[in-house]
Amino acid sequence: MERIAGCPNLRDMGGIKVKNGYVKPGRLIRSGALWRLEDKDIAKLGSIAAVYDMRSENERAYHPDPEIPGAEYIHIPITENGRRRFVQSKRTLPDKVEDILEGYRCSEPASAQRMREVYSGMVLSADAGRCLEGIIRTVVEQREGAVIYHCSAGKDRAGVISAMLLRLLGAEDSAIYADYLYTNTALSHELEEARSAALALIGDERAANYVLGFFAACPCWLAAALDTLDKNFYSIEGYIAQMTKVTEWEAEEFKRICIEKSPD
């Protein structure tokens, strides 16, 4: 899929290697917030069956999604309690950075520790199960058109849901991590802006790196999510059985629809 300037972390999951082939293009699209999409950008997306918005009510109110012709809109906020203060309570980048720096000044636990807790909490969230169930069923029921699922940056909430979808489709963890970490490439400009904002506010390299820890994708965070899944549910199939109402037939049909033998 062609890169869209207003939504740099929007990407088709097509082409990722899985157990019996590759993820089929035009089925699963992960993204950050869509509010900057223009009509010409929406036209590039092709047929969209549904949009799953995982943002909070406040995030949606400030930056509502644009209308995508023919797409069903489903709002399932995934908000683990620990992430609300430093992600959802502020709107502008300087405000978000200042909010995070409050934790730095108060000697709160390192960003890596806090984010591992956030990622583990998202896996155990009932809303994550609802979102995964919805995406799977939309693909199975609609059969044509892509499903877009997104949060604000397309990193944390979209990252966890993507990892679980790829686990279900049979991707190796190396492919799952590669997809997750691509966010740092897609959002390289935004990451530099966050670091610069922190330096401007406090003038401390250590503080700037602390802030950057909340904005970048880090493999240890995703590892916390996958470890939580494995320890509590033993497998993605166990997760689906306990946290969703997706049947075995629906899971297999989802795989059939989303996997092709060779990449386009």
What positions do the PLM features span?
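Cys-dependent protein tyrosine phosphatase-like superfamily
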Residues: 1-148, 160-264
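Ser/Thr-glycine-rich phosphate-binding loops at phosphate-binding pockets of nucleotides
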Residues: 153, 157-158
